[in-house]
Amino acid sequence: MNCLMFFKMLLAFSFISLFYVGNAQQSYGNSTVSALFAFGDSILDTGNNNLLLSVSKVNFYPYGRDFIGGRATGRFGNGRVFSDIIAEGLGLKNLLPAYRDPYLWNNDLTTGVCFASGGSGLDPITARTTGSIWVSDQVTDFQNYITRLNGVVGNQEQANAVISNAVYLISAGNNDIAITYFTTGARRLQYTLPAYNDQLVSWTRDLIKSLYDMGARKFAVMGTLPLGCLPGARALTRACELFVNQGAAMFNQQLSADIDNLGATFPGAKFVYVDMYNPLLGLIINPQASGFIDVADACCCTPTHLIPCLDASRYVFWDVAHPTQKSYETIAPQIIENIKAKLA
């Protein structure tokens, strides 16, 4: 794998100019959970990086091309991202607003917001490399959110009910493995890959504990994507990078096993592991079954696709590292049902 090229392509997401477009929210109000809170990386980020001096920003065209009104909101894709689709599937609202959106409405606070930051990870080195919001700092944002929520709802009991009945969706590990370990090699002298995966799982547990101590009780923890099959990873050979996929699969296996055993550590909490690797790999292996025609190329934003493809719904990936809205919509229904079954 040409790691330097992959990293440069990831850095190509950067734009320093600041741009904001508000996004109207539709509330549903038929959910068995109170709210959705998203933490982690660009798979879930709905615009928290827009005002950062970061290489990981996408608040510019053609991002958001297929979003409502064709607006670039800071989501890493052509339209809605995974956190939006999960929020809708849980019956909350069809868009999950970014907490750092300066125009965030108070009435959105009770049904959930997004704290995730594109380019972030569990490892502090990952966030420093990309200029994103480290997961520990996302927890600090959540603390500030609780203070704001208390002021909006007017009483502690109601605020506690929102916090304890919400689903906490976590996506982390993608950038730690793809960037910090394989691309920059920042941790390769310190850790073997199995040891680094162990450390990432430990950091995941620390993140869960921080949220648990603030009242969180329902956790949906996502594994990584098949990182070796991202267009950025297969740009030279067009084949999936087996070793990178093996590293991601190893982390996912360790994470899943740990999640299964956390109930004894966190009394009263519920957990579900969200498999992203195998559903997306299924689209890559058998794209025609879901109406896709291209799995190796990105629709947009690569040297070979400076002009975006005409129909992103025919592509599994929007850019070098992120699935299209259609891909998320294709794999989400089973995941949503699993979350409902395990966290109700």
Swiss-Prot record:
It is found in: Secreted. Keywords: Glycoprotein, Hydrolase, Lipid degradation, Lipid metabolism, Secreted, Signal. Its EC number is 3.1.1.-. InterPro entries: GDSL, GDSL_lipolytic_enzyme, Lipase_GDSL_AS, SGNH_hydro_sf, SGNH_plant_lipase-like. This is GDSL esterase/lipase At1g73610. GO terms for biological process: lipid catabolic process. Residues 1-24 form the signal peptide. PROSITE patterns: LIPASE_GDSL_SER. The active site is at residues 42, 319, 322.
